[in-house]
Amino acid sequence: MKKVFDLSSEYHLSETQIESFRRNGHVYLPEVCSPDEVAYYREAISRIAWQNFPQKKNDERPFLQTLNLRYHCTKVMQFALSARLGKIVSDLVSKPISSDPNKKSLGIRIFHEQALFKEPKGSLTPWHQDQYYWPLATDQAVGLWMPLVDVPLAMGPIRFATGSHRNGFVKQVSISEQSQGFFQQFIDEKQYPIWHQEMKAGDATFHNGWTIHGASANQTDKVRSAMIVTYYPDGTRVDQLSNPSRVNDAKHFLGGKQAGDLADSPLNTIVHYS
């Protein structure tokens, strides 16, 4: 019988890792999934992703993207809704630590998941803030980025402007050449250090929704495949639908909820509660 990897076991975070996430707006966690676990999910994610990626060829695009694959594949559903990933997010945003003793644990909901594949020689991913897109009225929304293959620096792993989440919303600008230029100047002016490093398949980063981030070009002849999942605390309300992307996201990923509504549609399963 083929072994099933349901990601139900816990990944234990140190206080240092939790403090680093809150201070820097991102944290790197090694081997969140083991090599066997990554192999178990990679085949299904890759197969469903390639079936759903846009067919039109565009050599200038920074990545191939398709969302909510979990409704096409049980394995992707298992991955995105896994207790392990939900518990990590809960610990990062709510677990009491010595310097923050009054924080309480809380439920964590999924916003959406997506496959992001950067093709060989694919261009850089411009600097941007995810929460420009996410209509979530919280500063505790969290994005997971996990490579499904080993990603050396030449392949374009994710990179972060450390500490940039503390600015919150910066500007109404979507991911583009314009956002790359604007945020690069902003990063330079604020003198934010840039974090990036090579990652193994199954390693993961978690980042705050306001953390400025992007990725360099894929200079290799291999596809950089990664899985992204976005989570937020239960009790969050829908934020202002202040741009077309937020209108679209509320429609497709929050079940048509409107500004001020609780973000608790049937699409937004609670993946962890304590």
Name the predicted role of every residue range:
Residues 106-108, 112-113, 123-125, 140-146, ...:
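Generic beta-strand structural signal
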Residues 130-141, 192-193, 199, 222-223:
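A short beta-loop-beta micro-motif enriched in histidine and acidic residues
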Residues 106, 131, 136, 146-157, ...:
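Active-site region of the double-stranded beta-helix
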Residues 129, 177-190, 223, 242-248:
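Short, surface-exposed loop/helix-turn segments at secondary-structure junctions
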Residues 1-24, 29-127, 133-135, 173, ...:
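Non-heme Fe(II)-dependent double-stranded beta-helix
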Residues 151-212, 236, 260:
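Double-stranded beta-helix
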Residues 6, 51-55, 61, 204-206, ...:
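Non-heme Fe(II)/2-oxoglutarate
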Residues 123-130, 138, 154-160, 169-173, ...:
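A short secondary-structure junction signal
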